[in-house]
UniProtKB/Swiss-Prot annotation:
The lineage of its organism: Bacteria, Bacillati, Bacillota, Bacilli, Bacillales. The chain crosses the membrane at residues 31-51. This is Cell division protein DivIB. It comes from Bacillus cytotoxicus (strain DSM 22905 / CIP 110041 / 391-98 / NVH 391-98). Residues 52-255 are extracellular. PANTHER family: CELL DIVISION PROTEIN DIVIB, CELL DIVISION PROTEIN FTSQ.
Length: 255
């Protein structure tokens, strides 16, 4: 027994600890990662298919002739549409089919908002059709008759006339400055024996203008300058057909 080796308890404890560590199963970090990703995918699919992913707000800008509801309908986007199913390009193509829309930009705002920015063709006038007004656009298209008294955009009113002359006039109206265009209240096609393109304009300032379709926009450039020469409160006829001048109508009445 003298040669027997005595092992102290404190010497054996570290060996037992190391043995326990070796027996402990390793943590599978990759498996945990896969499970986490799978869990997130399941959550996403549930959200994607649930009403929670539906559009909550649709904002429309720049529309005059179409209501917000009509824009939404034509775009194909509703409050029942999932945000993730909205394709901005497809919505834009749908809206560009409308004759009044010149350009459109659809933006998605995560998580559930849509912005629709519209640019309409400029309204250059209203055609008086049996007492009802039809907007005439710069692209030459006319819209449906407006409800009585509703004028979304300030523009002149005129009676329909020859299509050929109408196209010429539209081309000239596009060249007018917005200020001059807003000054025109009514345009009448009044051909004469010497000028089949003669026009009579009734201005919002109360004056009458005699002019012609040829170079109409260029002739109208003189209108603001002539206004400065007319005495306030007096009625005048402004002639822009050949020369550029005006005459007071109340002087003729006195004679």
């Amino acid at each position: 027994m003298k040669n027997s080796k005595v092992i102290k308890l404190q010497d054996r404890v570290p060996k037992l600890k190391n043995q326990k560590k070796r027996n402990k199963p390793p943590v599978n970090h990759r498996l945990i990662l896969y499970i986490s990703i799978l869990f997130l995918l399941v959550l996403f699919l549930i959200y994607f298919r649930s009403p929670l992913s539906n559009i909550k707000k649709i904002s429309v800008f720049g529309n005059h002739y179409m209501t917000d509801e009509q824009v939404m309908e034509k775009s194909g986007i509703t409050y029942k549409t999932s945000y993730f199913r909205v394709t901005a390009r497809q919505a834009e193509e749908n809206l560009k089919k409308q004759i009044e829309i010149k350009s459109v930009d659809v933006k998605k705002r995560f998580p559930n908002k849509i912005d629709i920015h519209i640019e309409e063709y400029v309204t250059i006038g209203y055609i008086n059709k049996n007492g009802k007004l039809q907007p005439l656009l710069e692209n030459g298209k006319t819209l449906d008759i407006l409800p009585s008294g509703k004028l979304p955009v300030a523009a002149p009113i005129f009676e329909p006339f020859k299509e050929e002359k109408m196209k010429e006039l539209i081309s000239e109206l596009e060249k007018l400055t917005p200020t001059i265009l807003r000054s025109i209240s009514e345009i009448r096609y009044t051909p004469t024996t010497s000028n089949e393109s003669h026009l009579t304009l009734y201005m919002n300032e109360g004056y009458e203008v005699s002019t012609t379709i040829q170079d109409f926009a260029k002739r109208m450039e003189a209108y603001p300058l002539i206004l400065k020469q007319i005495e306030p409160g007096r009625k005048a006829l402004i002639d822009l057909e050949v020369a550029t001048y005006f005459k007071y109508l109340d002087d003729e009445k006195k004679k």
